[in-house]
């Protein structure tokens, strides 16, 4: 399974990469911004995209969600954000399959990934 992690914070991105890489049959792809993430999405066709919302450079996760879903309406997107839970509902309505509030609990994230792979 291929998972694309999109986060401008290196610590958050690398922590997720290390944890997910420990799982069997998981290939992790990393992007620091949404432009690179969308290019990697189209090139690598990951099974799941895990993205932050607030990123440096002015283009955030909302743009990425819209671009990916325009390209593939069935894309599996998980939003991980420090925003309030009530704010995360917006991203579910946009088409994200799951929204997780930071700090991320690994088991919660893995449960979401597992559910997406079963469906």
Regions found by a protein language model. Name each.
Residues 52-53:
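Active-site residues of response regulator receiver
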Residues 7:
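Conserved acidic carboxylate
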Residues 30-48:
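Acidic, metal-coordinating helix/loop segments flanking the phosphotransfer/catalytic sites
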Residues 10-29:
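Two-component/phosphorelay signaling modules centered on CheY-like receiver
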Residues 104-114:
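C-terminal output helix
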Residues 59, 63, 83-100, 111:
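Alpha4 helix (beta4-alpha4-beta5 surface) of REC/receiver domains from two-component response regulators
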Residues 79-80:
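Hydrophobic/aromatic residues positioned on beta-strands within the core alpha/beta folds
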Residues 39, 62-73:
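Short amphipathic alpha-helix used as the core "switch/output" element in two-component signaling
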């Amino acid at each position: 399974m291929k998972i694309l992690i999109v986060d401008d914070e290196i610590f958050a991105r690398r922590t997720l990469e290390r944890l997910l890489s420990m799982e069997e049959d998981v290939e992790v792809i990393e992007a620091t911004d949404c432009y690179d993430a969308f290019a990697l999405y189209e090139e690598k066709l990951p099974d799941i995209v895990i993205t932050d919302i607030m990123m440096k450079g002015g283009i955030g996760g909302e743009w990425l969600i819209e671009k990916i879903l325009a390209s593939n309406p069935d894309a599996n997107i998980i939003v991980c954000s420090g925003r309030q839970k009530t704010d995360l509902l917006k991203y579910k309505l946009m088409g994200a399959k799951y929204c997780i509030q930071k700090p991320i609990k690994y088991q919660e994230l893995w449960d979401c990934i597992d559910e997406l792979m079963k469906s």
